[in-house]
Amino acid sequence: MKESLRLRLDQMVDRYEEVTALLSDPSVISDNNKFRELSVEHSDLMDITTLWQNYVGAEKDQADAEAMLKEASDPDMKEMMQEEIDSARDTIVEMEEALNLMMLPKDPNDKVPAFLEIRAGTGGDEAAIFSGDLFRMYQKFAQNQGWTLEILSANEGEHGGYKEIITRVSGNSVYGRLKFESGVHRVQRVPDTESQGRVHTSACTVAVMPEVEIDDTVDLNPADIRFDTFRSSGAGGQHVNTTDSAVRLTHIPTGTVVECQQERSQHKNRAQAMKMLISKIQQVKVQAQVDAADTIRRDLVGSGDRSERIRTYNFPQGRMTDHRINLTLYKLDSIMEGDLDEILDALLREHQADLMASIGGA
C-alpha cells in the first residue's frame, strides 16, 4: 500500500477519535445542527476506520508469524506458521481492495433525494405505455428500498401509461443508487394493438437529478423566471382542484421548464417547482464539468445526449441488456417488478473501476 494512503488513513482514524470525543461534549449536544453534522461524519468514518485498524492488525499478525517461522525448527510448527502467513496475506489483499474502494472520491449528492423524470420518446402510444411500465418498475424498487416516491406532475397517455411523469424520490442514498439510470431506455415487444404479432421498438428517456438546496451555487435572477398557474388534474383528466394551484416555471435564458401539481397549495407547488428548476440548471452545470473532464462517467451516463441508448428491454426473449457494460440478464419479469439490484450493483462496480483507473493514471 502506498505510504500516502497510509498517512491519509491514519489521519482519518485521528479525526474519527476526535469526532467521537466531540459527540460527548455538552456544548455540541446542545447544538442540534452541529450534533447532526458530526453524527453524519462519525458514521461516514466508522467503517473505514474499523477496516483500517483490522488491516494494520492483519499486517502485525503476518509479521509475527514470519518471525516465528524463521525461528521454528519443528516441521509441524513451520507448517502452522506458513498457514497463518498465507491466511494473513489473503486477508490483507481483500482488505486493501476494500480500502481502495472506500477511499475513492465521493459524489456529494449521493445521499440526497432525487427527481426522477420519465418521458415517452419514439413509438407513440406504445412508448407512453412503456413509460408507465418504467414508472411502476422504479416505484416497486423504491418500495423495496424503503424510499418514498411522490408524483409531482403527470401527463397521461391516451391509451395508458404516461407521456411524461415527474417524481421526487427520498430516502437513504437515493441519488447515488439511481444516478446511472439516466438515458434512453428501449423496449422491444408486441403491442396489445398489434394484430400481426410483429415486434415493435419504442423508447423512453429517463433523467435522474439530485435535489440540491437553494443556495448560491445557482444564481437565478427572478426576472428570468416566468411564473404560470393552471388547474391541476388527476387521472382521466378529472379536475382535483377548482383553483389554479398547479405551477409552471420557465427559466427564460435556458428554456428550462418545470411543472408541479402535487399539492393543493399554490405556494407549496411553487416552492417544489423552484427546487426542481434549481436541480435541472445545476445538473446542466455538472454535466458540463463532466464533459470537460471527459472520462470518469464515460461508459455509465455517456454524454447526456438523449439519443444515446443505454438499455434494451426485449420482452419476447425475456431479456434486459445494459449496453454500457455489456450486461445481459434473462429475468425481465422480475426486473420489471423492481428487481434492479444486480443491474445497479454492476453499474456501480464499473464506475468504481473507472475511478480507480483514472486515479491510478493520474
Curated annotation (Swiss-Prot):
Belongs to the prokaryotic/mitochondrial release factor family. One of its GO terms (molecular function) is translation release factor activity, codon specific. Peptide chain release factor 1 directs the termination of translation in response to the peptide chain termination codons UAG and UAA. Keywords: Cytoplasm, Methylation, Protein biosynthesis. SUPFAM superfamilies: Release factor (SSF75620). The modification N5-methylglutamine is found at residue 238. It is found in: Cytoplasm. Methylated by PrmC. Methylation increases the termination efficiency of RF1. This is Peptide chain release factor 1.
